[in-house]
């Protein structure tokens, strides 16, 4: 028999009710807890980073692809591409626009895939490293950058993997140092009169 007096019943966690037994407010709270729990997990962070990277990469790829058409189509391109450019200029305007939008879509999708892939891998590796080390410091990002950069370049050989590791680690360190630069103590003269 459990003693119920002097507030001792509040020492144990409340009994977990089935979802159907909860009030609408409690169902909303439980749903929000589940969403926050997923977003805080390593797979959740990885999926969110991948989706965000995909969206950002698509916008950036679309912008960069639109810059490829900043010269008139009849202008000769160095390297002997003037024949292909002249053929493009001979097409009707509607066909030219259709081809340009198709090319922009392909470039935007390619950029979106690359950014999404990099974001997903980096976030997953950083979260896993942080979970293994049980620390939140700059070395998690450096390690994740090295693993991500080396992993992306491993098919090109060990030298490329080493350069990718060093490059991603240095970039990650620079970004982390910038982002955490405001976490330090305020300057000595900040609060003096």
UniProtKB/Swiss-Prot annotation:
Transmembrane segments: 47-67, 138-154, 159-179
Localization terms from the record: Mitochondrion inner membrane
Keyword Disulfide bond: yes
A GO term, aspect molecular function: mitochondrion targeting sequence binding
Domain of life assignment: Eukaryota
GO CC terms of this entry: TIM22 mitochondrial import inner membrane insertion complex
Disulfide links within the chain: 42-127, 146-165
Presence of keyword Plastid: no
Keywords from the named record: Disulfide bond, Membrane, Mitochondrion, Mitochondrion inner membrane, Protein transport, Translocation, Transmembrane, Transmembrane helix, Transport
Main location per the UniProt record: mitochondrion
Assembly behavior: Component of the TIM22 complex, whose core is composed of TIM22 and TIM54, associated with the 70 kDa heterohexamer composed of TIM9 and TIM10 (or TIM8 and TIM13).
Family statement drawn from the similarity comment of this UniProt entry: Belongs to the Tim17/Tim22/Tim23 family.
Function: Essential core component of the TIM22 complex, a complex that mediates the import and insertion of multi-pass transmembrane proteins into the mitochondrial inner membrane. In the TIM22 complex, it constitutes the voltage-activated and signal-gated channel. Forms a twin-pore translocase that uses the membrane potential as external driving force in 2 voltage-dependent steps.
Annotated protein name in UniProt: Mitochondrial import inner membrane translocase subunit TIM22
Organism: Candida glabrata (strain ATCC 2001 / BCRC 20586 / JCM 3761 / NBRC 0622 / NRRL Y-65 / CBS 138)
Gene designation: TIM22
